[in-house]
Design a protein with these regions (language model features):
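Non-catalytic, surface beta->alpha helical segment in thiol-disulfide oxidoreductase systems
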Residues: 114, 119-147
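Short linker/helix segments within small regulatory modules
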Residues: 21-30
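Short cysteine-rich clusters marking metal-coordination/redox-active sites
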Residues: 12-15, 32-35
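A short beta-strand-turn-helix
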Residues: 44-63
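Short Cys/His-rich micro-motifs in 6-15 aa windows
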Residues: 36-44
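Thiol-based oxidoreductase modules, predominantly thioredoxin-like and allied folds used
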Residues: 46-47, 67, 78, 82-86, ...
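Short pre-active-site segment immediately N-terminal to redox-active cysteine/selenocysteine motifs
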Residues: 60, 67-71, 114
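Cys/His-rich microdomains that often coordinate metals
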Residues: 19, 39, 79
Length: 147
């Protein structure tokens, strides 16, 4: 389940439908075949359990997930940098945000012990993990090296 040289399976952020997108079209603002919404918004998507499962389990793009909480100062400080990283990394990497207070199942499943923690998933499996707030360029470099 990786991006092939000819196409990628991209999950729609609005309706959750899988969309096969030819690789040359990934950077051309593709839209969902079902609901016509843009497949990439240039910003991280807030994920609940179901949308996390769809993007990580069904899509073929690497998925970078920021596990955070509203009460966490470093998490809030890193939020603008993570949003800027989405503008740089999409459409090669999908970026999600998981609030560990609202979706504690995922924090438990992935044994999140400190926040912010970022995990890069490839093919539905954890490929890399890092903890601590980072500036935009460090997020981009780390994600590209892990993807």
């Amino acid at each position: 389940m990786s991006v092939t040289t000819d196409s990628a399976l991209v999950v729609c952020p609005d309706c959750g439908a899988p969309n096969r997108v030819p690789a040359p079209r990934l950077g051309q603002h593709p839209t969902c075949g079902r609901c016509k919404a843009p497949l990439f918004a240039g910003k991280p998507l807030d994920a609940d359990l179901a949308s996390f499962e769809r993007h990580v389990g069904r899509g073929s793009l690497p998925v970078l997930v920021d596990f955070w909480a509203e009460w966490c100062g470093p998490c809030k400080a890193m939020a603008p940098a993570y949003a800027q990283a989405a503008q740089v990394l999409e459409p090669q990497v999908r970026l999600l945000k998981v609030d560990t207070e609202r979706v504690p199942e995922l924090g438990q499943r992935y044994q999140i012990r400190s926040i912010p923690t970022m995990i890069l998933f490839k093919g539905g499996r954890e490929a890399a993990r890092t903890s601590g707030a980072m500036p935009t360029q460090a997020i981009v470099q780390w994600a590209r090296s892990a993807a």
